[in-house]
């Protein structure tokens, strides 16, 4: 209810910007909610997309890239913890690459700089962090699967 009240109040004074929503102060009780409300998180994602820090693709688009992997030259990187990423990489050697967020520095040189990179993790957050690292190191032809493996599984694309 607090988030609805906060956004409704903002709407009374005009159209709130993404920045307004990202910085909205929404009441919360620490045992029951996080300090950053869903409204703030959604606005931050929108801001990252508009600024180019996040280049999202839908789970459908990711699934299509994966199905056409023999023809599209995309490098598929899995940012989940090594146990999950390695299991999928073992099923698809040479096509699926386990590059866990915590291993990105050590495995950076294994990521091609001359091919598009498609990132995935469990929900999208870890792969977003990997995307930022890659961008900061000059690798910019990178997309991130929104919703990660959870969205792919819900669609029926179980890697």
Language-model region placement:
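C-terminal catalytic lobe of FAD-dependent flavoproteins
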Residues: 1-21
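Rhodanese-like catalytic fold shared by cysteine-dependent sulfurtransferases
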Residues: 16-30, 34, 41-63, 67-74, ...
């Amino acid at each position: 209810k607090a988030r609805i009240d906060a956004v409704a109040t903002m709407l009374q004074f005009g159209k709130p910007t993404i920045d307004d929503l990202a910085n909205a102060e929404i009441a919360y009780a620490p045992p029951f909610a996080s300090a950053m409300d869903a409204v703030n998180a959604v606005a931050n994602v929108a801001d990252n997309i508009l600024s180019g820090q996040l280049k999202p693709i839908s789970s459908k688009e990711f699934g299509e890239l994966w199905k056409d992997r023999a023809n599209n030259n995309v490098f598929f990187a899995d940012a989940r913890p090594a146990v999950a990423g390695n299991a999928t990489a073992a099923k698809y050697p040479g096509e699926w690459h386990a590059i866990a967020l915590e291993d990105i520095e050590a495995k950076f040189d294994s990521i091609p700089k001359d091919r598009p990179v498609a990132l995935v993790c469990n929900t999208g957050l870890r792969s977003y962090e990997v995307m930022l690292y890659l961008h900061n190191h000059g690798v910019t032809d990178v997309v991130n699967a929104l919703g990660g493996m959870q969205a792919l599984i819900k669609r029926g694309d179980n890697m």
